[in-house]
Regions:
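Beta-sheet-dominated interaction scaffolds and their linkers
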Residues: 4-50, 56-60, 68-71
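Signature of Gram-negative chaperone-usher
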Residues: 9-18, 60-69, 129-179, 196-198
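Tryptophan-rich substrate-binding surfaces of secreted polymer-degrading and adhesive proteins
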Residues: 69-130
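Solvent-exposed, conformationally flexible loop/turn segments
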Residues: 30-35, 77-83, 119, 157-163
Length: 198
């Protein structure tokens, strides 16, 4: 979405776009134990005379917003910065407490929160159960969240001007404090679209 004038905005007037980090729009959601957070974003373009539709090569009939997971796999002998998060197959997240280079073999990942794991010249700390994209639901209305999904179909053609409200509900099932704020794992992406002047 970084190259489009159509973006996710924090306000209906489209004055505050979601911040972009590493080419991906980021919305920080932090949980204080098991809870759900509901909110609304706005998808649109404030640039006059723009139109969005799907690319001719797409098999989709409509633009779609899709909840997706970033690749957070551990990689051997890789340089990492402090704050980087990995998500191995054990269902937990680990944040690098210092920069360095990972080791040649996969470390033994502790499932105890706040436990440190040495790995090459870096150190990982267990920060809790991993987020799962299935815990994020999208809908075109707040009432639609009860049957929301991780994919939302938008109109076939979207004109700039009035934004489309995109409601979201994020559910945290873990009792611990959780945040992937330094290195987001879950994101919203768009399918193959094309923007043009009209």
């Amino acid at each position: 979405m970084a190259d489009l004038t159509f973006k996710l905005w924090q306000d209906e007037a489209m004055t505050v776009a979601l911040p972009v980090e590493n080419g991906v729009p980021v919305l920080r959601i932090e949980f204080n134990g098991a809870e759900s957070k509901t909110g609304v974003l706005y998808f649109g373009s404030k640039t006059v005379g723009r139109q969005l539709g799907v690319q001719a090569s797409s098999t989709d009939a409509n633009p779609k917003l899709i909840v997706a997971e970033s690749n957070q796999a551990w990689v051997a002998s890789k340089a990492v910065t402090a704050g980087k998060i990995v998500q191995p197959e054990n269902g937990y997240m680990y944040r690098a407490s210092k920069g360095g280079t990972t080791g040649a073999t996969v470390p033994v990942w502790s499932t105890t929160v706040d436990t440190g794991i040495d790995d090459g010249t870096t150190r990982w700390v267990n920060i809790g159960k991993a987020f799962d994209k299935s815990f994020i639901k999208l809908a075109l209305s707040e009432s639609g969240l009860s049957s929301g999904s991780d994919i939302i179909n938008l109109p076939a053609i979207i004109n700039s001007g009035a934004p489309i409200p995109i409601w979201f509900k994020a559910i945290n099932t873990d009792a611990g404090l959780r945040s992937d704020a330094t290195d987001p794992i879950v994101r919203i992406q768009i399918n193959k679209v094309i923007e043009k002047a009209v």
